[in-house]
């Protein structure tokens, strides 16, 4: 089995391509179910955010797995593989594990150290579990990754100097306008990104805030928290007349603000400039609007300059987290190396249980007058004896599994206990396709 990551991210693909390969939240579970049925794919988790679409997979063959994941992406978004391939980055084995840790800890984010990605990874993993797209390997790996990411943010100061993309958008506005106290700010979208932007705007002194959303009630709830006003998107054109700063993140599949709409609005703004930041993927604002004289449009890729301001400080903390990641990878690989011994241990326990069961049958035949309580006591104690006898051999088997040349030693182990090869292979197949995480083999 192999671990594989196929990634489209802000480092390798411009926003106009990333928005073509963005999974809508409502289709993620269906996408993972579809991918799970692809040849070679044993487990998968799909993560899709404004800056990346990534497929994490356990595959039985690397070459076949790579091909069918690329094909899945192309088919899902109705593109040719040749169109998609140039923008893909592929990580394998140790590189794939390291990438997942770095992404979840915020080290691979446009804004190094941001915490939003941790929640997004966790949500994607839980969705994958719900549709049974994860199994033994990913259930353990993602558990370790999420735990480490939380520890990294609590044990370092990377979160103190890190910024979200929403914060970067606000910082850009402050560079242009200075104080935001007198600026009329318009927020399009009442989701997480919109609220993060509003939090940062409020913290920077903005008080004239309007929140707009397709569902007015959501806009009202968010606006009330920050003493702003809420309006329906049907009033968008009027709101654009009043705004000085616009930050948009609606998650709509088509442009919310078109060049035609903005051309009409500009004529009524009496030459007042409008600073627009589009942090949505797919984009909310028609990029052609930047051609208009009074509209200054920035998209998510333009925020990189603002992000760089605090980068040096964050990178110092990132080095500490990378060291933590490397330690955690060693622990995961040790666990992974012992996974192959589970079928052997299971076969050994099954053989011991069969002997105990045969002994109980023989005992009941020789002493037919045993009460039910006496049978239970005898059964419990014979199982206890077996568990104590097997404890040390099982620990040794696990240690051997983590060593070089383990296969020959484990073969000798199987021979000593007269374990049938077919039985062990059958157990291995069960483990390989298991869909529920089991951290250890249960005792008898």
UniProtKB/Swiss-Prot annotation:
Residues annotated for NADP(+) binding in this entry: 189-194
Chemical reaction(s) catalysed: (S)-4-amino-5-oxopentanoate + tRNA(Glu) + NADP(+) = L-glutamyl-tRNA(Glu) + NADPH + H(+)
Gene3D superfamilies: Glutamyl-tRNA reductase, N-terminal domain, NAD(P)-binding Rossmann-like Domain
Enzyme Commission numbers on file: 1.2.1.70
Active site: 50
Keyword list, A-Z: NADP, Oxidoreductase, Porphyrin biosynthesis
Binding sites annotated in the UniProt record for substrate: 49-52, 109, 114-116, 120
GO-annotated molecular function: glutamyl-tRNA reductase activity; NADP binding
GO process annotations (BP): protoporphyrinogen IX biosynthetic process
Pfam short name (any one): GlutR_dimer
Keyword Lipid biosynthesis: no
InterPro entries to which the protein is assigned, alphabetical: 4pyrrol_synth_GluRdtase, 4pyrrol_synth_GluRdtase_dimer, 4pyrrol_synth_GluRdtase_N, GluRdtase_CS, GluRdtase_dimer_dom_sf, GluRdtase_N_sf, NAD(P)-bd_dom_sf, Shikm_DH/Glu-tRNA_Rdtase
Class of this enzyme: oxidoreductase
Site (Important for activity): 99
Other information: During catalysis, the active site Cys acts as a nucleophile attacking the alpha-carbonyl group of tRNA-bound glutamate with the formation of a thioester intermediate between enzyme and glutamate, and the concomitant release of tRNA(Glu). The thioester intermediate is finally reduced by direct hydride transfer from NADPH, to form the product GSA.
Function comment: Catalyzes the NADPH-dependent reduction of glutamyl-tRNA(Glu) to glutamate 1-semialdehyde (GSA).
Domain notes for this protein: Possesses an unusual extended V-shaped dimeric structure with each monomer consisting of three distinct domains arranged along a curved 'spinal' alpha-helix. The N-terminal catalytic domain specifically recognizes the glutamate moiety of the substrate. The second domain is the NADPH-binding domain, and the third C-terminal domain is responsible for dimerization.
Family stated for the protein in its record: Belongs to the glutamyl-tRNA reductase family.
NCBIfam families: hemA (TIGR01035)
PANTHER family: GLUTAMYL-TRNA REDUCTASE 1, CHLOROPLASTIC
Subunit structure: Homodimer.
The protein's name: Glutamyl-tRNA reductase
Species of the source: Bacillus cereus (strain ATCC 14579 / DSM 31 / CCUG 7414 / JCM 2152 / NBRC 15305 / NCIMB 9373 / NCTC 2599 / NRRL B-3711)
Lineage, opening ranks: Bacteria, Bacillati, Bacillota, Bacilli, Bacillales
Gene of this entry: hemA
